[in-house]
Amino acid sequence: MNLKNGLLLFILFLDCVFFKVESKCVKGCDVALASYYIIPSIQLRNISNFMQSKIVLTNSFDVIMSYNRDVVFDKSGLISYTRINVPFPCECIGGEFLGHVFEYTTKEGDDYDLIANTYYASLTTVELLKKFNSYDPNHIPVKAKINVTVICSCGNSQISKDYGLFVTYPLRSDDTLAKIATKAGLDEGLIQNFNQDANFSIGSGIVFIPGRDQNGHFFPLYSRTGIAKGSAVGIAMAGIFGLLLFVIYIYAKYFQKKEEEKTKLPQTSRAFSTQDASGSAEYETSGSSGHATGSAAGLTGIMVAKSTEFTYQELAKATNNFSLDNKIGQGGFGAVYYAELRGEKTAIKKMDVQASSEFLCELKVLTHVHHLNLVRLIGYCVEGSLFLVYEHIDNGNLGQYLHGIGTEPLPWSSRVQIALDSARGLEYIHEHTVPVYIHRDVKSANILIDKNLRGKVADFGLTKLIEVGNSTLHTRLVGTFGYMPPEYAQYGDVSPKIDVYAFGVVLYELITAKNAVLKTGESVAESKGLVQLFEEALHRMDPLEGLRKLVDPRLKENYPIDSVLKMAQLGRACTRDNPLLRPSMRSIVVALMTLSSPTEDCDDDSSYENQSLINLLSTR
């Protein structure tokens, strides 16, 4: 690796670590207010139901009335075309922003626009509803539970400490800054300072206005423990800048020395060792020994000890200038091309520089962790764009096999084996690495199938790591709808159990060959997830009858129904709402070993961990 590329890779790493953490929140505040615009069809009982929380209970009018003594005089009637303030908890959602997620149950004729702009009086948006819900906006099923996200503010000590209670205020066409300030009894400049980028005359959007408590007084901003936000950011950025200059100096010196030493090394010591990672069942982590590729192994927090650095010219030549004939796939972060490099079949993912976070994340994971059931990273390139070079897997991905047109149906035994292979790969990153890795995008499209119909987990661009002993962390929402568990979709809670939930959905896909979210219904098209379909089937008086209707029809009668039932029961255990009740990947591996080979012996350490799950899969 030359000095230029090494510095680029290092700067990308710093960008990933330091500069992707803006706009984070740590904690919320006890209460915020929502400015609810009343139309003639809306009554107080409707508002209390829509805005139900730990502050406002169902049909609890007194709390709402206590904040609106000047406009609400009677429980039975509201004045149309006025506003009332509704209290709600203001929480830190996923470590990303302040808000609260309400739950709305749909009825016939509902759509996202009606929910956002009528029932929730423009306190949320259609875009937020789409982001936090997996339903097709054009086909929302009746009685579906919709996550309604309303943002809020707890104040800003840099502007004023006199105001700690804020109103989430949706602007309307007749609003102006002067009108709002007069009604609130506040200075226009103060309101503008709290909403520096807001245009109050645009007639739409959300602003935050200091609000009054139940006694009609402005509520002061209580100081929180720790350094003030502005000071903390200033100190942190100054420290980072100083550290950056120092590290770049040391880094440049290091590379100059390594470039001199590299010419003395035999060429074979810098090549990727296929023997170590392609077929061995031995596991290798960051503690493993081995020769470093170039100088990138000296990077703090990023290892490329088993990866080769390719030049752009070499990749372009091998792919015929990244021609369409060589293109074999398109993902969320870039296109994938087939190429033969240095005598080996490869798949090259070409990513934009904007995807530096995902590039570094995947590079870090796949150079740290090697396992038979994880796709093997061969090398990378950082010239022009960002490139990752993987081993080429002959048969594409599981999703193509299950959902593709014209593909041969996978035999049931192969489906069980692929499930076991994938579970082993996930078990390894969950339980045999330090720190622990969480994939965050487990789905059939990210499980590759080799020529022997064995599975390998791929696409680690969204992987998160947590230190051993930390059960959960909070993060921004990424992944694929239909595979997200409730605690992640609603609150951004991340733990290994989100991979377990998604794996349960994959088990359902293996049984049905259906997508995770599909359209169903006889007269009205509606969306339904596989989790819901299997819940209904397994709750029937005769669950086997329900399961037979869900099994991939291409299998005809060539499957053991007992085995299907056991896999469905395992999928159900994986997709429980409470993450604490879901099995670990280790228990899942044991269960699938029992399912794939009932006579196969299991080691004692695995067997004792979830005996009830093993018993579940051993008997009907």
From Swiss-Prot:
Annotated residues for binding of ATP: 328-336, 349
Signal peptide as annotated in the record: 1-23
An MF annotation (GO) of this entry: protein serine kinase activity
Listed GO CC annotations: plasma membrane; vacuolar lumen
Record-listed Phosphoserine modification sites: 269, 273
Principal cellular location given in the protein's record: membrane
Impact upon substituting residue 334 to E: In hcl-1; S.meliloti induces extensive root hair deformation and continuous curling, but is unable to induce the formation of tight root hair curls and the subsequent infection threads
Transmembrane region(s): 232-252
Record's subcellular location: Cell membrane; Vacuole lumen
Pfam families: LysM2_CERK1_LYK3_4_5, LysM_RLK, PK_Tyr_Ser-Thr
Tissues with expression: Expressed in the epidermal and root hair cells of the developing root hair zone during nonsymbiotic growth. Accumulates in roots and nodules during symbiotic growth with rhizobia. Localized at the cell periphery in a narrow zone of about two cell layers (e.g. L1/L2 zone) at the nodule apex upon infection by rhizobia, from the meristem to the infection zone (at protein level).
PTM field: Autophosphorylated.
Glycosylation sites: 46, 147, 199
Spans within the Cytoplasmic topological domain: 253-620
Keyword entries, A-Z: ATP-binding, Cell membrane, Disulfide bond, Glycoprotein, Kinase, Membrane, Nodulation, Nucleotide-binding, Phosphoprotein, Receptor, Serine/threonine-protein kinase, Signal, Transferase, Transmembrane, Transmembrane helix, Vacuole
Membrane-topology annotation of the record: Single-pass membrane protein
Extracellular side: 24-231
Annotated positions binding chitin: 108-114, 136-142
Reaction catalysed by this enzyme: L-seryl-[protein] + ATP = O-phospho-L-seryl-[protein] + ADP + H(+); L-threonyl-[protein] + ATP = O-phospho-L-threonyl-[protein] + ADP + H(+)
Keyword Isomerase recorded: no
Outcome reported for the amino acid change (mutating residue 87 to S): In hcl-3; S.meliloti induces extensive root hair deformation and continuous curling, but is unable to induce the formation of tight root hair curls and the subsequent infection threads
Role according to the record: Putative receptor for S.meliloti Nod factor signals essential for the establishment of the nitrogen-fixing, root nodule symbiosis with S.meliloti. Involved in the control of root hair curling after S.meliloti infection, probably by modulating the reorganization of the microtubular cytoskeleton in epidermal and cortical cells. Regulates a subset of Nod factor-induced genes.
Family per similarity comment: Belongs to the protein kinase superfamily. Ser/Thr protein kinase family.
Name the record gives this protein: LysM domain receptor-like kinase 3
Annotated organism of origin: Medicago truncatula (Barrel medic)
Gene: LYK3
